Structures are given as structure tokens and as C-alpha cells.
């Protein structure tokens, strides 16, 4: 019932990439998380992830990859995509359904462009093709906070910019409590990943994405904007767009039908 959880790491350039795997299905499904993973990799989380995503674990073998643990000061989303492709090769995954959320969505755009054979179907969730003023403002603020180790403030600010008012009324107290206790050893890694988001662009290659693609966004997204999803849709041939009218950047946690929608697209 725990869906065969596995914690693993892949050696790469004198560091490692942590990953978890779980699920009893035959089809591989890859999930690439957003910037929050910059504070803490997925190391050791296979069992809780299997329980959290059990609706997917029944039909897929799910893989969630962190970026490399130690990064240079500058490391682009395109380079992260090359790391992901390398990790897939090391695990014998020739082709997979792929979901990228926020910064993870920027990474998998490059994966689909540079290695089309590796992506069977693609979901781009709350992400964008290139930076806009809203994203740059958020990431620049979080970089400034990270430089003085105010990661608790980053967590709280992210929640305020991600969730609906009704969700925040019920949950913000928890984020503030957790933020007061939160510590990370990965400040430099987080900053590198945030800078990669500011520098991201896939504009020249999006027209070459040939796999079936679903773009999911939130009309009230205060981090990448809902318009960014519409922009992606206009640039990726034959893509589908679903825009949640009542949610923002945290729609993948708030929208009750989100993972059902993901599952139906892949099946």
C-alpha cells in the first residue's frame, strides 16, 4: 500500500542529484518542483511523497528529482534540464510524462525543446516562457531575504503570494509558526536557482515543442501571472490551456481537481 518508495541519489560532476520514486504503475511520470526545493532537496522523502501523491502512485511510477545538491554561482534552467536528462538516462527512463511546476516548468521547457524524444506528454503548471516584472520583483525580494538568511520570511511571503484569502485565513498561522523555526543549509543553492528563474528564457525554442502539452495557470497568480500561461499557450503549437479563474500560484495545492486533471491528461 506504500507504493514501493525509493530514496536515491545520482552522482554528477562531483556532487549528487537526489530523487525519490514511488508508484506501482508501468508508465514513468516525472515531477519537477519549483523554487522551494532550493531550500531543501527531496532527500529521504519517498514515503511521505508516496502518501501525498497516492492518486498518481496507483497508475504511474512517479519520479521527483531535485536539482544538483551543490551548484556553481550561476546555473541556468537549460543546464538544469541537461542534468535532468542525464538523471533519466542513468535510471533507464527513455521517455516519460513530465510535469513542471513554476521554476520546474521552466526547466522542463528546455527538456522538451532539447530532448523531444524524452518527453511523451508535458504539463507546464504556473510557469512562464521568460521573466516578467512580477516574477523579477518576487525573486529579487526573496534573493535579498536569502542573503541575510531570512528563509522564514521567504516562506511566509511565498504563502501570501500563492494562496487565496480563504486558504490563508485557515493556514497562514501555521506558515508563520513554521517560518519562525525554519532553518536551511542551502542559502547559496536557493539564490542560484532564483537567479536562474530571473534569467530564464525559452522563447526561441517553444515553437519546436512537439509533444502533447497542457498548460495550467491561475488567473490570480501573483508570482508569474495568469497572462504568462496564456503566453505559453500562444507559443507552443497545438497546446491546451486550462486557466483556473479562482486560484493563483498555489492552485496545485488548492484546486480540488488539479491532480485528477493531470492524471486524465496523461492517461
Cite the ranges covered by each PLM segment.
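Flexible "cap/lid" loop of the alpha/beta hydrolase fold
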Residues: 106-109, 113, 119-149, 189
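Short beta-strand/loop motif that positions the catalytic acidic residue
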Residues: 209, 215-217, 221
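Conserved alpha/beta-hydrolase catalytic His-Asp/Glu region
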Residues: 133-136, 153-200, 204-205
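Catalytic histidine-centered segment of alpha/beta-hydrolase-like enzymes
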Residues: 247-259
Amino acid at each position: 500500500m506504500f507504493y514501493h518508495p525509493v530514496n536515491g541519489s545520482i552522482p554528477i560532476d562531483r556532487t549528487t542529484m537526489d530523487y525519490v520514486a514511488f508508484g506501482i504503475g508501468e508508465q514513468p511520470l516525472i515531477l519537477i518542483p519549483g523554487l522551494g526545493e532550493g531550500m531543501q532537496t527531496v532527500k529521504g522523502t519517498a514515503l511521505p511523497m508516496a502518501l501525498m501523491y497516492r492518486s498518481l502512485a496507483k497508475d504511474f511510477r512517479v519520479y521527483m528529482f531535485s536539482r544538483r545538491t551543490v551548484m556553481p554561482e550561476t546555473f541556468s534552467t537549460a543546464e538544469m534540464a541537461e542534468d535532468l536528462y542525464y538523471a533519466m538516462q542513468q535510471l533507464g527512463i527513455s521517455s516519460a510524462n513530465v510535469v513542471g511546476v513554476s521554476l520546474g516548468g521552466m526547466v522542463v521547457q528546455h527538456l522538451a525543446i532539447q530532448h523531444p524524444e524524452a518527453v511523451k506528454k508535458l504539463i507546464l503548471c504556473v510557469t512562464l516562457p521568460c521573466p516578467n516584472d512580477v516574477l523579477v520583483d518576487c525573486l529579487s525580494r526573496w534573493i535579498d531575504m536569502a542573503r541575510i538568511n531570512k528563509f522564514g520570511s521567504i516562506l511566509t511571503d511565498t504563502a501570501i503570494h500563492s494562496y487565496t484569502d480563504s486558504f490563508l485565513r485557515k493556514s497562514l498561522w501555521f506558515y508563520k509558526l513554521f517560518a519562525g523555526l525554519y532553518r536551511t543549509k542551502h542559502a547559496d543553492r536557493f539564490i542560484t536557482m532564483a537567479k536562474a528563474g530571473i534569467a530564464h528564457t525559452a522563447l526561441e525554442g517553444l515553437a519546436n515543442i512537439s509533444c502533447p502539452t497542457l498548460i495550467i495557470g491561475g488567473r490570480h497568480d501573483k508570482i508569474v501571472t495568469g497572462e504568462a500561461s496564456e503566453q505559453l499557450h500562444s507559443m507552443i503549437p497545438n497546446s491546451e490551456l486550462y486557466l483556473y479563474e479562482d486560484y493563483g500560484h498555489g492552485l496545485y495545492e488548492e484546486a480540488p481537481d488539479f491532480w485528477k486533471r493531470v492524471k486524465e491528461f496523461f492517461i
